[in-house]
Amino acid sequence: MLYGRIFFNSGVQLLSMADKKFSLIALVSFTALAIIVLYHNISPYLTPSDLIAQGKAENVQVVGKIVSVNGNTFQLSDGKNTITAVYNGTVQRYDAEVVVVGNWDGKVLHATKVLQKCHTEYKGG
């Protein structure tokens, strides 16, 4: 029986050389595209020291401690280095561990999200 370009002969599938090449090219292209998309969506946690060493970066996640707040600007530290971050929202409190998501222009972190880490700890009893 004939179904498109694939022939069935006693349950055995026969593909032409052109079909095999097309299938291989399609598979390799899809795999490469998936790897590229995953690579660009993965955003590892950085410290302020890592960020300073890296230079400009987009869509970064920076973990650190808020050491001071002044309006919509705050200072984020990892104990070694401190960076300035700007956020158009409310920072709940300083002296808190946070993850800041945003874009780094080399001098200021322009935050799109500020996520406070949970400060409570499980204590088994």
From Swiss-Prot:
Gene3D superfamilies: Nucleic acid-binding proteins. Keywords: Membrane, Transmembrane, Transmembrane helix. The chain crosses the membrane at residues 21-43. One of its GO terms (biological process) is cytochrome complex assembly. Pfam families: CcmE (PF03100). One of its GO terms (cellular component) is plasma membrane. This is Uncharacterized protein AF_2191. It comes from Archaeoglobus fulgidus (strain ATCC 49558 / DSM 4304 / JCM 9628 / NBRC 100126 / VC-16). The lineage of its organism: Archaea, Methanobacteriati, Methanobacteriota, Archaeoglobi, Archaeoglobales.
